[in-house]
């Protein structure tokens, strides 16, 4: 495929995770201690089920910060953002809570931008997945060349005009894509949003509940995705190889991983708002984060839709929270094969 503006064929080079690491320069994340900025985003108005705002506290109480520090991460906790419900937040057509969701994301954008300007990997603890509008927008203000890996049972790419539920946690990607700019009406609360991604900048993994309108958008825009059918057919190793080759095979750039825990099978993460059977296994979920970590290019991470109130038993809550913590730790270097410090006796 010709490189844009070059007028000639450019050979496609597929780098392995090891080669990505070897090519990192002295300023890369892989050549110095991992610096993490944690932002708690206790927000639920992008969907109808209460309890997802408890996610950040549950993850911290599970020892996330201490475990990151034990992994030799330099951690700064920015605390929980304080979100305010906008009064008289009437629906826009059927879109619910537009002003409240828009304001929350604008607030998150500013904080993520600050974290990135401070040179830290942003770690947003959700909260519902509508917050990725702010998380990715803030990241893109500092790293406009970023790419996104979106792990989810859902594509979250409904527009305000195609949505059948009106829930904004099913629409964030449509606000972020430049190709859909003309499909987004002027919604109260979102005048600040500037699309920051092109269709070629995102890859989905784990899809298995996609609305017809969303499927049309994915196909029309040529967006790369691996539904669970492709995961089953190819295996997660091939999926990750193709994902990384597609996004960073030609040029290294920052990776933003937006991870909805409902991407995993409900047997693994039952305490979430929109579980869908037939999802990623625990092992597949960790393989994704391990491979992204190995690139040394992870620059932003969202852990979304942990809802402790939806676990039917304490075990279901603990299983979901512990899995979310494990995914996060894996992003920052905890490997199933084991780890050791570079410090020698």
What is the meaning of each model-derived region?
Residues 120-122, 199-203:
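Short active-site oxyanion
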Residues 187-192, 208-226:
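Active-site-proximal loop/helix segment associated with metal-binding centers of metalloenzymes
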Residues 199-201, 208-214, 250-255:
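Aromatic-lined glycan-binding groove of carbohydrate-active enzymes
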Residues 117-194, 295:
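Active-site histidine-anchored catalytic micro-motif
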Residues 12, 17-20, 24-44, 48-123, ...:
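Catalytic cores of soluble, metal-dependent hydrolases
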Residues 5-7:
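Residue-identity detector for glycine
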